């Protein structure tokens, strides 16, 4: 093969072929057709000779490779070229490199075969994985069954063990009871023997103890009697001092003015004056009340006020509903009673504080803690407040109030307990620092969500208050407890006409000469629509 290749290299056929092509190109236009054909055939013959030599070299090279070497190269290089050459020769077209060759088809077929093999391999792997998954699931089910069996066995054994333990406990208890009964019997016998011996010894010592106790009891009785006599003597002296102070005060007032005053006309101060102290030592302060701090008293009063709203108000409504069918009238009556009770209690507190100041002045004059002493005395002696007189004043004020429309057979004395509780709460609230008071409320005012909450039967879109159900509790300008109000649209103007025609069951507040009229006129506070003769819009 090397010799043939050497001959081909040494042969100058390829070099002369290039020279012939160049000369033919120069003479192509000048030559005739036959001359051009002859030149072309000569070139083809020369190329055919070169191809023959190359095919010989190819054959020898393939033989040197054996049976299998070089097969892929021939398939990939020679066969596609031959296919394209023969196809182009048969069609009379030049060889085009873009025409798909056998190599491309072979490559495509090979890729298709490899793709199908891969798909088959993947299908086989997937089926194997599924088989493994099914096997694992079966194994899990079997393991669950195998685990449940020992669980059930252990549960059964546990129940059996518990039953055995319970039986053993019962047996142990029975044995312990038997042992205890035996010990008790033996202890009883021993205790009886010891008791008989102790009784003998105690009988001997009891005689001596009885004699000693008789002596001690006689001495204690004598000492207690002496203490009682001393206490009675002190109380008598204090009462004498109180009476003498009251007498001097009354004499001084009668000497100053003979005309009757509005304050003594009411019974709200008669009882408290009769029991007014002349000095801070007239009545010993209650230890339970003295220990209460301002915060504790405030919390207790707030709780009482809340109970009065939640329970006392409902009880009063039940009492009034027996005589009055209209719920609006009942709620108005209770609200007015609460407002009047606060007003009367505040007035009573002012008078009570003035009297305490006068009674404490001789002993505490010039003291820096005089006001503190007055406040402490009032806190410790809240039981001196004449609440029943305040109740009577509240009922009288309600009888002349033109806001309340009611049948003549209803008596406001039904609300005495409720009014008394409100008066006591309001009186005690004045002892706080700062004092608590109810908020001013007027029918037809703009509803304030911070002070009041609407009742269940209200119109929640109405901006004005139709009437109040319960007042709000205030500390200075801060709301401590919200009140309750009813809001309705268009109902306030109708209520104004009905209120102007309502009846009064007692004397008119316009009469200036009556006792009730003087008491009402003497009140000094901001005008309220509840007390005005005409409704306020």
UniProtKB/Swiss-Prot annotation:
Residues 179-217 have a biased composition (Basic and acidic residues). Transmembrane segments: none annotated. It comes from Bos taurus (Bovine). It holds the Pfam family MIEAP. Residues 253-287 have a biased composition (Low complexity). Residues 115-253 form a coiled coil. GO terms for biological process: mitochondrial protein catabolic process; mitophagy by internal vacuole formation. Residues 171-221, 249-293 are annotated as: Disordered. GO terms for cellular component: cytoplasm; cytosol; intracellular membrane-bounded organelle; mitochondrial matrix; mitochondrial outer membrane; mitochondrion. One of its GO terms (molecular function) is cardiolipin binding. Residues 1-273 are annotated as: Interaction with YWHAG/14-3-3 protein gamma. It is found in: Cytoplasm, Cytosol; Mitochondrion outer membrane; Mitochondrion matrix. Keywords: Coiled coil, Cytoplasm, Lipid-binding, Membrane, Mitochondrion, Mitochondrion outer membrane, Phosphoprotein. Belongs to the MIEAP family. Its main location: cytoplasm. Key regulator of mitochondrial quality that mediates the repairing or degradation of unhealthy mitochondria in response to mitochondrial damage. Mediator of mitochondrial protein catabolic process (also named MALM) by mediating the degradation of damaged proteins inside mitochondria by promoting the accumulation in the mitochondrial matrix of hydrolases that are characteristic of the lysosomal lumen. The lineage of its organism: Eukaryota, Metazoa, Chordata, Craniata, Vertebrata. The modification Phosphoserine is found at residues 85, 127, 154, 157, 286, 508. It comes from the Eukaryota. The keyword Phosphoprotein applies. Interacts (via coiled-coil domains) with BNIP3L (via BH3 domain). Interacts (via coiled-coil domains) with BNIP3 (via BH3 domain). Interacts with YWHAG/14-3-3 protein gamma; a protein that also plays a role in MALM. PANTHER family: MITOCHONDRIA-EATING PROTEIN, MITOCHONDRIA-EATING PROTEIN-RELATED. This is Mitochondria-eating protein.
């Amino acid at each position: 093969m090397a010799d043939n290749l050497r001959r081909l290299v040494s042969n100058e056929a390829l070099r002369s072929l290039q020279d012939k092509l160049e000369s033919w190109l120069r003479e192509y236009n000048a030559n005739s057709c036959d001359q051009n054909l002859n030149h072309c055939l000569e070139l083809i013959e020369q190329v055919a000779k070169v191809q023959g030599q190359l095919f010989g070299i190819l054959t020898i090279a393939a033989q040197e490779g054996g049976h299998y070497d070089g097969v892929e190269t021939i398939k990939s290089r020679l066969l596609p070229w031959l296919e394209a050459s023969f196809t182009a020769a048969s069609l009379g077209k030049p060889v085009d490199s873009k025409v798909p060759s056998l190599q491309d088809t072979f490559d495509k077929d090979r890729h298709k075969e490899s793709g199908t093999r891969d798909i088959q391999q993947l299908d086989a792997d997937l089926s194997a994985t599924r088989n493994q998954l099914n096997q694992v699931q079966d194994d899990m089910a079997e393991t669950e069954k195998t685990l449940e069996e020992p669980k059930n066995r252990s549960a059964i054994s546990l129940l059996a063990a518990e039953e055995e333990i319970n039986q053993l406990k019962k047996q142990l208890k029975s044995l312990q009871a038997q042992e205890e009964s035996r010990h008790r019997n033996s202890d009883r016998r021993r205790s009886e023997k010891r008791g008989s011996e102790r009784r003998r010894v105690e009988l001997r010592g009891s005689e001596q103890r009885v004699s000693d106790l008789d002596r001690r009891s006689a001495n204690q009785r004598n000492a207690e009697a002496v203490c009682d006599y001393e206490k009675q003597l002190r109380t008598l002296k204090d009462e004498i001092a109180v009476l003498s102070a009251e007498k001097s005060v009354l004499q001084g007032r009668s000497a100053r003015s003979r005309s009757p005053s509005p304050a003594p006309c009411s019974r709200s101060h008669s009882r408290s004056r009769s029991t007014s102290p002349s000095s801070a030592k007239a009545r010993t302060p209650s230890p339970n009340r003295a220990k209460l701090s301002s915060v504790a008293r405030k919390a207790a009063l707030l709780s009482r006020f809340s109970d009065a709203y939640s329970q006392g108000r409902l009880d009063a409504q039940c009492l009034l509903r027996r005589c009055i069918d209209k719920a609006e009238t009942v709620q108005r009556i209770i609200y007015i009673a609460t407002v009047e009770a606060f007003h009367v209690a505040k007035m009573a507190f002012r008078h009570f504080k003035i009297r305490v100041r006068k009674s404490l002045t001789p002993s505490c004059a010039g003291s820096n803690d005089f006001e503190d002493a007055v406040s402490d005395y009032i806190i410790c002696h809240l039981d001196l407040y004449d609440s029943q007189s305040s109740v009577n004043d509240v009922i009288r004020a309600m009888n002349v109030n033109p806001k309340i429309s009611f049948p003549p057979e209803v008596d406001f004395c039904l609300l005495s307990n409720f009014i008394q509780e409100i008066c006591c709460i309001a009186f005690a609230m004045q002892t706080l620092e700062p004092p608590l008071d109810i908020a001013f409320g007027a029918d037809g005012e703009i509803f304030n969500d911070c002070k009041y909450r609407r009742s269940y039967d209200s119109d929640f879109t109405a901006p004005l208050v139709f009437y109040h159900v319960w007042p709000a509790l205030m500390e200075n300008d801060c709301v401590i407890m919200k009140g309750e109000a009813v809001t309705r649209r268009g109902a306030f103007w109708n209520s104004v006409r009905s209120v102007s025609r309502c009846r009064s069951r007692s004397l008119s507040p316009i009469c200036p000469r009556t006792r009730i009229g003087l008491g009402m006129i003497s009140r000094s506070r901001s005008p309220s629509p509840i007390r005005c003769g005409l409704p306020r819009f």
